[in-house]
Amino acid sequence: MRTKRLSSMVALAAAICVSAPHQLRAGGPSTSASVRGVVHFEGKVPVSKPVSMASDPVCAKQHAGPLVTQEVLADPKGDLQNVVVFVSEGLGDRAFDPPADPVVVEQKGCMYQPHVLAVRANQKLQLVNDDATSHNIHPQPANNREWNKAEPPGSKMEESFAREEVAIPVKCNVHPWMRGYIAVFKHPFFAVTGKDGSFDLSNLPPGTYTIKAWHEKLGTSSQTVTIGANETKEISFVFKGM
């Protein structure tokens, strides 16, 4: 009887191991493959539109000169900023716990800083109002809960998004020029390009992946890569002027 009971327990444990998602942490020698590269813009960079803050003198006086929109930012070499690069396929049923530390969005000079950011699903998003005027933060998701909250000067608040989405537009109902984007992922393999257009997706398990690059105005581009253990693949994305 004890032998039958032990066999049943072993079978049950095996079934649980098979059916449960793989709980993995990024990092470690067995998952040290990487995909890195640069995102380029090809063609004439669109002229940024002027931003008028005349409706709120508190905002206007924080800037020495006129401001322009941040829609397409590329340097003279064509390195493209504010592109979200991420793994879209290939991770299977692997699951990853969200980080405990929040991602911070500042409202400073009546602008969202950063303009484009990425967070994990269910990771805390801390919204900080550094301005001496009130804001009203209003994300407009397609797959997540929509919310619309006022934030007085000098205050902080926390929110989160439960589902993957690339990317959620965010506006301020008080200041119409304030626009930003938040990309949400259930895994840690993503990056947002800085001024040099570079990205680095590190600590990937070996495998074949679809890598996508998303830009708020230029759309989405994708390619497939296969990487082995401890291997680094160099790739690049090129967006062309519309």
Regions found by a protein language model. Name each.
Residues 1-4:
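N-terminal secretory signal peptides that target proteins for export/translocation
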Residues 9-19:
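Bacterial N-terminal signal peptides
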Residues 24-242:
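Extracytoplasmic copper-binding redox domains, predominantly the cupredoxin/blue-copper superfamily
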